[in-house]
A protein has these predicted regions:
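Flexible, solvent-exposed short loops/turns enriched in glycine
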Residues: 54-87
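N-terminal secretory signal peptides
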Residues: 19-61
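Contiguous interface-forming segments/domains that mediate binding rather than catalysis
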Residues: 21-22, 39, 69-74, 82, ...
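C-terminal partner/receptor-binding element of secreted or periplasmic proteins
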Residues: 77-112
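Sec-dependent N-terminal signal peptides
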Residues: 4-13
């Protein structure tokens, strides 16, 4: 009887753990200097419910949307976030343009 009650008490918390968004940290060293798109040495990537992809600044914990789903969540007030351009680096090979987020979007999608 005690085991059944304990199991019933732990069951809801196990679902919460499974539903929690995954977060990984990526660095300039890991991704390569040529692909690195940010003004910081490392950032965190996460996938929130609905495949909303965000970059997180680990020192401030500010999150930045990197796909349309995430941007819509920020625009609607469902999530907090700042424009990604704040931490996006200029592309040295294409003056006036920012670095591509494609490798980071691809990596963040693996967390969904």
């Amino acid at each position: 009887m005690k085991r059944i009650i304990l199991s019933l008490l732990l069951l809801p918390s196990s679902g919460i753990a499974l539903a929690a968004p995954q977060v990984i940290t990526v660095s300039r060293f890991e991704m390569g200097k040529e692909k690195w798109a940010f003004t910081r040495e490392e950032v965190m990537l996460t996938c929130r419910p609905g495949k909303a992809l965000f970059v997180i600044n680990p020192s401030t914990l500010v999150q930045y949307p990197i796909n349309d789903v995430a941007q819509k969540r920020v625009d609607s007030g469902e999530s907090k976030g700042q424009p990604i351009d704040i931490i996006l680096a200029d592309d040295p090979n294409n003056p006036g343009q920012k670095m591509s987020l494609a490798p980071f979007i691809e990596r963040a999608q693996t967390l969904c």
